Design a protein with these regions (language model features):
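Cyclic-nucleotide recognition modules
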Residues: 1-38
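Residue-level signal for short amphipathic helical patches enriched in basic/charged
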Residues: 6, 29, 55, 95-96, ...
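Hydrophobic alpha-helical core bundles mediating ligand binding, dimerization, or RNAP-core interactions
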Residues: 19, 38-49, 64
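Basic, amphipathic alpha-helical hairpins
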Residues: 23-30, 48, 71-77
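Residue-level recognition of alpha-helical structural elements
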Residues: 30-34, 53, 78
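Short alpha-helical segments that sit at the start of domains
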Residues: 47-71
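Phosphate-/nucleic-acid-contacting segments
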Residues: 63, 67-127
Length: 127
């Protein structure tokens, strides 16, 4: 069920033109709707841009380091929580899960990164 636990709901269909043009009354709720749609679209565009940045790397190691760098804001050392499972991370970087895990093990042995229950810690620059 689309509405979850709600007993009744309403779906409002509207044309794209209705979203992109201001109404004659310049009402606040319409302005807020346009603003919210803009924020959603820019968030999705940023996420797609980051994904392209990661996928443009050749090796699994380069993809992982690029992704980790994006998550830490480019800090030399940093820590963050993976927003998904390691299997989903392999899908995100378009890599075989076992090959990705092998590369993560090598990176851990080289003291580049630690991963514990989804918590990723970087130990030095990712250059």
């Amino acid at each position: 069920m689309l509405c979850g636990d709600v007993e009744s709901c309403r779906v409002w269909f509207m044309s794209a033109e209705h979203l992109t043009r201001r109404c004659e009354k310049a009402c606040t709720h319409h302005s807020r709707l346009v603003e919210n749609m803009f924020h959603i679209m820019t968030g999705k565009a940023a996420a797609l841009s980051e994904r392209v940045e990661v996928l443009s790397r050749r090796s699994i190691r380069e993809k992982l380091l690029c992704y980790f760098g994006l998550q830490t804001g480019g800090d030399d050392c940093g820590s963050f929580h993976l927003p998904f499972t390691l299997s989903a991370l392999a899908d995100y970087i378009s890599a075989d899960r076992s090959a990705m895990m092998r590369e993560l093990r090598k990176m851990k042995e080289e003291h580049l990164v630690d991963i514990d229950r989804g918590q990723v810690t970087l130990h030095h620059a990712l250059a």
